[in-house]
Amino acid sequence: MATGLTAADRCAVPAAAAACRAGAAGPGPRLRADPSMTTTDPAMVEVPAADFRHAIGHFATGVTVVTSIGTDGEPVGTTANAVSSLSLDPPLILVCFDRASATLEAVSAHGAFAVNVLGARQQQLSANFARRGLAAAWDGVRHRRGPTGSPRLDGVLASLECTVEHRIAGGDHDIIVGRVREVETSGTDTAPLLFWRGTYASLGQA
């Protein structure tokens, strides 16, 4: 039933609520944006990063811990909220990762990862993976290895185990497209953990 950051991994949010984008990548082909699809109009001024962060913060998201295996065989993981379903046929998911993340190198080498969806009472788990070193984040965390070897965390709402299909460059982040190989849900009505306007939130609040 129920199973399934380093400083470089987390976004600029309060330390007590450092659920954010993560760091990972994979062995699939690395794609870049089509230059013909970008604007060169000098009148188009870019929005300041702080303004963009403030505006996009009004879009509530779920919170996950993305896990994989390092080159030393040890588990790695990072908190991520830039996660979305991409396709049902085939089942694809995308995750946005900080390009400076240590988890990026692990997923790139391993070629697989798991997305663990957190419940409302798992704020501390989210914070641990958002701001601690990779090894310290795993202290006391119960988990088991899935078919790809990626860790599935005990007690989460759902876990999706994926193999890497593509890695797409996107500014200071990379977009990882994963093919979902196995899913597992808790079978409970536990509310999800949300991230909204720079802090954790509940369904009623958001």
Locations of regions flagged by a protein language model:
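Basic, polyanion-binding surface patches
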Residues: A2-A206
